[in-house]
Amino acid sequence: MNRRLVGFLGIGAWVLFWAASVALAALRPSYSHVVNTVSELGAVGTPHATAWNVFGFIIPGVLLAIVGATIARTANPVPSLSRTLATVLLVLCGLAVAGQGVMPAVMANGVADVASISTRGHFVCSLISAAAWAVGALLLVGPMKRNPYWQNVYIVSAALVVLTLVVALALRGTLPDGLAQRIGNAFFCVWFILMSLKLVWLEPQLASSVRVGGPV
């Protein structure tokens, strides 16, 4: 698949995620972006839950899996164990996001029913998506530094991962759940958007390099 197209898909995944979040939350007057987590939009039995799970989790997750694989293989063009692991982890990240929509949480008054298999699966997918992304992205920092086409983003990439982890640990319990989650999601989102933009801008450069016989 054309890397430029994949880059646009990565941007589109997040546009869809945030647009669905805003639109579906607006249909629930009691929902607060500060207090409520995004999982509550798709909780079993809530209004428009299926719409959120499809447009907020499943479609964006599948797109992020495709984008993640392309980012890993483009940023690290040399076949290696590190490249394979980064590719697998970023694909797993996207699929785990989609998995949160396949297994929505069961909640009552904003409290998760941890006895529910679906709820447990939802939270496991959430943890997997975060951990797989963090490790996968960090595995690409070295290759990005060595790749002349990606050298200008390796520091930002590492910083966004660190910021996401710091926010996840530091803000838990100090801010309302919805706000803390969205701040963490913002760094996660920015990483994918920046890397997707890199794919969009990079494709013409790579095509030009191939035409003149330069390195890919």
Label each residue range with its predicted role.
Residues 205-216:
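Short, intrinsically disordered terminal tails adjacent to the first/last structured region
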